[in-house]
């Protein structure tokens, strides 16, 4: 199995856990590797029931209408929470939007890669760590990522104007990645 990651940083956490990795870009911008796939990386919580850095072993991926794209057994990650992931095409940082998505789909968290992996027909499971919650959003970091999944220079500039908030968000992301590599080992 290959742990498919959006970023090199997520792939480093997966390799630390002893997994073979492939980096496909945010929102899956590169070809998927051959064989069985595991969606591995960060996710944003859609409700307050999930904590920062909580690790999820998802058993279901749904689309924006709540339709199941993939369903399977958990991978058995010790200490992980079973969850449903929502496949999205952009970061949802607004707490009100997150609540609506949770109510409409029943999903616990959202990410931008699991949907494409589910549609490939080769997804075996999803291991994700919560990087942000409705109470502790990504803030400036979310602005750095444009709607197309690419780095936005305008967003980087805005994040630079809010260094404390950016530092807090980055700290939460680092903590989630650390937990992901520890729990998955």
Language model feature labels by segment:
Residues 1-185:
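Glycine-rich phosphate- or other oxyanion-binding loops that anchor nucleotides, phosphorylated ligands
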